[in-house]
Structure formats: structure tokens, C-alpha cells
Amino acid sequence: MSTKVKKCREPARVTLPAPEEEEDGEAEGGESQRRRRGWRGVNGGLEPPCPRAPPSPGPDASSEGSPSRWRTAGMRDKGRRQAVRGPAFMFGARGPSLTAEEERFLDAAEYGNIPVVRKMLEESRTLNVNCVDYMGQNALQLAVGNEHLEVTELLLKKENLARIGDALLLAISKGYVRIVEAILGHPGFAASRRLTLSPCEQELRDDDFYAYDEDGTRFSPDITPIILAAHCHKYEVVHLLLLKGARIERPHDYFCRCSDCAEKQRLDAFSHSRSRINAYKGLASPAYLSLSSEDPVLTALELSNELAKLANIEKEFKNDYRKLSMQCKDFVVGVLDLCRDSEEVEAILNGDLESAEPLERHGHKASLSRVKLAIKYEVKKFVAHPNCQQQLLTIWYENLSGLREQTIAIKCLVVLVVALGLPFLAIGYWIAPCSRLGKILRSPFMKFVAHAASFIIFLGLLVFNASDRFEGITTLPNITVIDYPKQIFRVKTTQFTWTEMLIMVWVLGMMWSECKELWLEGPREYIVQLWNVLDFGMLSIFIAAFTARFLAFLQATKAQQYVDSHVQESDLSEVTLPPEVQYFTYARDKWLPSDPQIISEGLYAIAVVLSFSRIAYILPANESFGPLQISLGRTVKDIFKFMVLFIMVFLAFMIGMFILYSYYLGAKVNPAFTTVEESFKTLFWSIFGLSEVTSVVLKYDHKFIENIGYVLYGIYNVTMVVVLLNMLIAMINSSYQEIEDDSDVEWKFARSKLWLSYFDDGKTLPPPFSLVPSPKSFVYFIMRITNFSKCRRRRLQKDLELGMGNSKSRLNLFTQSNSRVFESHSFNSILNQPTRYQQIMKRLIKRYVLKAQVDKENDEVNEGELKEIKQDISSLRYELLEDKSQATEELAILIHKLSEKLNPSVLRCE
């Protein structure tokens, strides 16, 4: 970096201000001005400083040619000198001595004395326009910092003006739009990529264009003008810079290993991370999102998700990234809040041209791509916004407009009718899918009711299947009951009842629906939704249970076939059967633990529990139960987090107590802690107060072991019951309070997720009716085959036309070329016209920018306005004084001329 600092050979001469300056009020505090301008604190502050030359770069720096290393070494040496000289010389040793002319020039630039600045720039030949004060600021920086537009314009006309980039950054940070326009008009910004390169990159290329002083830049070296404007939310400045071609480059992926990222990471990892955050701050700024993107809503949603991921990756900057992610989400909500009609709401929620048209005209459903994306990225305030909810509610009651205004009793009656008449409705839909009945059944609300009714019937079958055992069973585990003497007992126990057959049909129907959903969404999107994982797990367990039951039935049937073909006696108790056949005649108490029927019954019980837990899936549809279901889900997450610490403590005490008492098997009051299994049981049930204190007592007089057992058992109970369980209760209470504080948003977000699962085409008929293909499915299948064959024919025809193209005449080619040119021009004219979605988005962004500007004006501090008025008055004062001096001179000349005419004789004598 060029320092522009020369070594002082002799003290500069002190020059007092001229009398005219005293008349103008500049003599006030002249001595303090000289001290402020870089005069050393010696002899009353009248001795000029003698700055030292900058340190010469070492051989390493010269060999590598790295200005940043040279600057780092120079700053290190300067820091040592300042530490030696003390804080009184913090700034005194940096700037060169100023002449009286330069000091007057800097004062005039700082206080907006336009006449003096203009006069000195036009008349003085010795003036250095790049002279700096004790803080290292030149006249341009002082004028911009005090918002003197006229002075800035005068200075920008001078050639070889330094630090124009820093003046631009200063004007942007203070929001001086007119000064920014003036600076951007300077020829210095005509250079290629002047606005896109960061100050650090610019410094490595040529000069100190963005430098504040010889020590570096005013802001972070990676801050470009447009990044700074975006940070400060200056909409007008961002617009100006975008028109000049400035853009914010999106940082590379965090795990990017390109040469550029690797080099930056190696040189300074902290600066690299800060530069990424500064870039993301600019990208996430509402000003930049509004003015730079063709689809600000989509850009903000994707950027919020990217920032949320970075918050989990870069833990050290977690709060910064989360704040930026929330800023993007608030921007999307702010744009949605400015919608004034359904067309604008539909445009934002759908995000394409087709959805921007009224739905009734086209007769197709909205895609709701932006809503799905917001749900995926958990932009809850956007989904729960009244404008979005009103549109979703309209789609929810599609083709059922009258039902929306009905009471809850009427809606419950509709649900009951649908549940009872579900088979007949399914038959009607199979016969006439495009009739009025078919349209009603395709309504999202009716699909939800049909699926809910089908699942309730499924749960009813599960209950009814166990109803014969509600009051107990007559057949004890050690008793066998058969229908005839030669019957194998297991044949009777493994037979499927009609309710179990219906349950199997329902399970197959639900499995078919899950497979179709998995095919349409893909494995990754399918697994993301936990309810899908629960459904798939539940159905898999059901299938495993029925498979094990079927295997047991096959084995029992084979045994029965053996008896029927080989045994002639009528009573099996009098016959000696092979062991593999005899086993199937035993009562339940003699079955093996690995028996397929026992495994089937255990899996079936687990599947039933999961089936009833799936009722929570439909609870968000109700305003009363929805928040409770959300709190329950959050509680389950807290329990899983708690289990990590719980298992660690539990295993430590379980192994320790087992090691302590494993040698005393049979020598204790009870078998607690003598085996790993007993240790687990004792410690687990002690959490609920169901274990005895005598679990650590020995029959022998080994008090040392017994006392250690008492101590460990007591510490375990205090740790688990008093500390960890209360910690879990506090976590659950905190999670519930978070849901309760924002219950409306959480509930509407969960309800919207439920609604969207029924908005897409398909899933009209619930299981098990979905197993039977409708005639509409065959029609769609035939249409797909037809379209595929047509596309193939078109490809063949196109290939033939391309092959025959060489045999065409020149006249035909000329005609075709003209027609193609005309078509291309017309097509381009169509492309240049903004789409309906772009027009709507333009209106919304314009409202957003206007609202942001109004809010900013209302939030501005009065001190800033008073300072601006004070500076304007100061500039006006100098102009009035200049006008006064000019008027005085003109009056003196006029009086002199009059005196010459009136007294010619006196003049001759003189």
C-alpha cells in the first residue's frame, strides 16, 4: 500500500489565520483546530509533528509480493511505536504536517464553506487536495461525513483525488443518497469491477481506492459498497448500485474445497468466516432481496433454509445465522401481509403464472408450491398468516361451500353419514368418478373425513377382535380344547377369524397407499415426515405378525395332515406321535418361547398400540386438541434428549452395583443386583419407588460391602429421582410453555400440514377400497400409453425431416428462414413482456419498499435531523458571508465611481 507519508526534515512554520477568517468566525478556537489537525502537544500545541517513514518490507514480503503482509508488518511496527510513546501520541505520529493553506482547506471542507473551497480549488496551485488531518481523513472524506453535497461535487471534479471508495462507503453508511449519486458519477468507477471487488481485493490490484488512511479501510476489508448498503437497509442506494452492475456473490458451500476457499481458510480462517457472514447479511437484507431477485419470496425461503443449516454447522456463529434466517422469514411474512386481494395471495402461495389466474376459470387446483416449501423449511408465521390460512380454508372446503358455514353438529352428522355409507360412496365413485358425487368426494374435506372414518372402522375391528376375551378366557394356558378327537390343538388356535381377515384387508389397503406415497414423494421426502415412518412401522409390524401367524398355521396344518394320513385311532392321546407332530398338541404352557404364534401375538399387540397412537395424526384438525398434540410431540423429543443422560447414569450404577454384589448370589435378602437382569429391574423400578431398601442388605456380616451398597444406592436415587427427573419435568414444562405462548401459530402450522396432505389429486378412496382400481385408473393408464407412442412417433418424424432437409430448394429455405425470423421476433416480444406473476410481485415489492421507507422515517432519531439542519445552516452561513463580502466590494467600487464623477477636481489635484 502506498502511504503518501514523507519524512519531516524541519519543523513547519506556524501560520496564523487571515483576518478575513476571523471575520467569518473561523478564528474561534483556532488553536484547538491546529491541535486537532495533527500538531504535537508540545509548546502549547504549536509544534508540528515529525512523522516517521513507514517500515520497509522485508525480503520475504518482497519475494512474495503480498501487500497484505507488508501492511500487517507495518501496522505491527506502528503499534510498537505507539505503545512506547504512550496514548497521547496515538494519532500525532501518523499524519504529515499541514500548511496554513491545507488547514484552511480542510476546515472549509469540513464545515461546508463552499466559497472558500471553490476559490482555493480554482486559484491555488500549491494546494494538495489529498492532504489529511490528524485522523487521516482528506477533504473529500470530511465533506462526505458532514453531508456537504456542494463541496463533494467540487472536490470530485479534481483529478488524482484519493480515497473516493472510502467516501462512497461513508456516504452509504450515513444514507446520503445524493452524495452517493455524485460519487458514483466519478470516472473512477468506470473501471471494470470497481463496485464488485472488495476493498481487500482492490488493494491487492492497484491502490488505496477504498482506504480510510494508511492503516487500512474504514470497514471490514471484505465489505463492498452494495454489501454495506444492504447491511444498512438503504433501498435507494441498493437500487443505484444494482443499476451500476453491482452484485453480492453468494459464498461457496461451507465444505467447499476449491483453491480459493482453501487459500482463504489457510491464510486467515477468522477473516474468511467473517466475510461469509457479511456476505450473507447482505444477501438476507430485505433491501437486497426486494430489488435484486426476480422472485424474492422463493429466494428468501431458500436462503432462510440455507442459513438455518449453517447455524447448525458453524456453531460459533449460530446466533448470527439464526438471526439472518429469521430476517428472511420475516421478509416473506411482510410481503404476504401487503396482499390486497385473492389474486395476489394466490400468486405468492403458488409462485407461478398458472396459479396466479383465478382457479375457477381454469378448473384445476393450485400447486401451493410456496406453501409446501414454507412447511418444509418451517416458516411457521408465513403458513399461519391470516391471508394464507384464508386461502387454504377455501381450498379445504372446495365443492362444499355451504358446509363451511354450518355448525359443528351438522359437520359431525356429515362425518357419521360418510362413515356409515362409505361402501356405497365408494361404489358410486367407481361407477361415475366425474359426476357430482365424484367431485364432492374429491374435496379435501371429504377425503379427510373418508380416511378418518375408514381408520376409525379399522380401530373398531381391532377392538372387536379382542372383545371375546374382555371378561376372561375359559381355556387356561395348561388346557387344550379340540372340536373332535383327531384334531390337532394348534389347528384350532391358529385359524384366522373373519375379523382378522378384515383387519388383514385393511392393512393391505393402507400398505398400498403408503407404497404409492413413497413412489410419488421419493424415499428422502417420505422419511422426513415422522408420521410416515410411524405408519410404515405399524404396517410392517402388522404384516410380520400375520406372517408369523400364517407360518404357525401352516405348521399346524402339516401336523394335522400327518395325523389324518398316518393315525388310524380315533383318540390321539392313545397314540405316540413324532416329536415334531406331538409338539402341536401341547397346551400353551409347553410352547417354546420362539414359537411363531407367540411371536405373532407379541407383534400384534405392539401394532395395536401404534395403531391407536396414530389417532394423534388427525388431532390438529381441532383447535382444542391440536395444541395438546403438538405439546405431546415436543415432550417426546425432550424425553429422547433426556434419555442420553439417563442411560449414561443408569448404566454406570447398574454395572457398579452388579460388580459389587455379583459374588453374593444366594447370600442376599433378595436377588437384587446379583445378575445384570436383576440389577436392571431393581434400578429401573426404584425410579418409581417400587424397589426396597433391603435390596442392598447381605446375610453375611460384610458391613463394608453393605455400606458401599447403601451409599451407591442412595446416590443413585438422589441423582435419578431428585435431579434428573425434576430436570425432565422442567424441560417438558419449558416446551409446553413455548407452545402455549405461540399456540395459535403452532396449531395453524400443524393444521396446514394436515390439510396439504389431502390437497393433491389422488387418495380419493380410503383403504381398503383403494385396492380396487377404478375405471378412471384404466383410462389414465391407456392415455399414458397413447401419449408415449405419440411422442415416439414425433421423434421419428422429426428425424426424418432433418434427414430430408438437404434436398429442399433455396427458395423454401429462404421462406422458412424469413418465417422463423418473424416467429423469433414475435416470441422475443412475448418473452420481454412481464408475466402476470412478475407484475403482481412488482406491485407487492413496491408496497414493501414504500412501507419500509415510511417506517424508517418514523423511527429516525431527532438528533440526526437537528445535526443535518445545523450543517445546512453552517453552509448557508458561509454562502451569506461570501455574498456579503461580494456585495461590500461591489458597493465600494460603486462609491468610488460616484466619487470620481462628483469630485473630478479633487481627483486631479490628488
UniProtKB/Swiss-Prot annotation:
Please give one Gene Ontology molecular function term for this protein. calcium-activated cation channel activity
Membrane topology, as annotated, equals: Multi-pass membrane protein
Q: Which GO terms describe its cellular component?
A: plasma membrane
The UniProt record gives the binding positions of Ca(2+) 3 as E860, E863, E865
Show which residues sit on the Extracellular side of the membrane: 467-497, 552-595, 663-702
**Disulfide pairings:** none
Q: Where is this chain glycosylated?
A: N478
ANK repeat start-end pairs:
100-129, 135-164, 166-192, 221-250, 623-652
According to its UniProt record, where is this protein mainly located? membrane
Similarity section: Belongs to the transient receptor (TC 1.A.4) family. STrpC subfamily. TRPC3 sub-subfamily.
What the record says about its domains? The cytoplasmic portion of the protein is required for channel assembly and gating.
Output this protein's name.
Answer: Short transient receptor potential channel 3
Please give the organism. Answer: Mus musculus
